[in-house]
Amino acid sequence: MKQLNRLPNAGRTNPDQNINFTFNGKAYQGVMGDTLASALLANGVNVVGRSFKYSRPRGIVGHGAEEPNGIIQLGSGAATVPNLKVTQVELYEGLEASSVNGWPNVNFDLMGIMGWFGRLMPPGFYYKTFMYPQKLWMTYEHFIRKAAGLGKTPVEADPDVYDKLNQHCDVLVVGAGPAGLVAAREAAEAGARVIIADEQSEFGGSLLASAQTLSSVSASQWVADMVEQLNRYSNVQQLPRSTVFGYYDHNFLTILEKRTDHLGLSAGKGQQVRQR
């Protein structure tokens, strides 16, 4: 399969290892190291979703958690996961994904006709328009829910295995960009127990896409050297693919670590811990 928009010798991918996947029922091919977003863009897929309310076509504009448009349903059956962002889904063999809205499909959405009546639908109009007769609200809600463009939760029992772990540290570094890596190293050298967490699959942050030099070496080499230094410290715990999402009383923080999400079917359902 041709990936017409694939840049040669660019990015942090391995072009020698192809990965097959499907999006909205159509087969595509990406390479090792792709996210679903980069694989779709390489294949010329520009429309990945539809806007709320007016169902206008939307494409990928971000490269991480900030992506507002590329919301997808991943997998099927009991293992399906709703409302993931294409920029945060690592590509794996056999991946199946679909847009969460757009009927009959994301490229031709009949709900797009709503844009013609925009002047008649100010923000919050549905809270007034669909109040009466009250007994029909459940009928109204059914169609409003479909127009909202949200994913579907599975009704079967979750086949995956999850874990929880309590860890203690003196310093928690959130984000493994250049500042985070230096902070973790300095704290480790001082003898502190350090946990450094980053939501990406690799440490480096903005330097992963940088062509600048630091300390007379390339940005990517500088990151590799810093990670190697951290590996030497027994008092440092590195957590890639980990999102720090809560800061509570008594310096209690919560982290979600994705352990096997990037492996897909090869991880074996129910055989390994998926997240903790």
For the regions a protein language model found, what residue spans apply to each?
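Beta1-alpha1 glycine-rich phosphate/pyrophosphate-binding loop at the start
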Residues: 169-232, 243
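Fold-independent oxyanion-binding glycine-rich loops
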Residues: 24, 43, 75-76, 134, ...
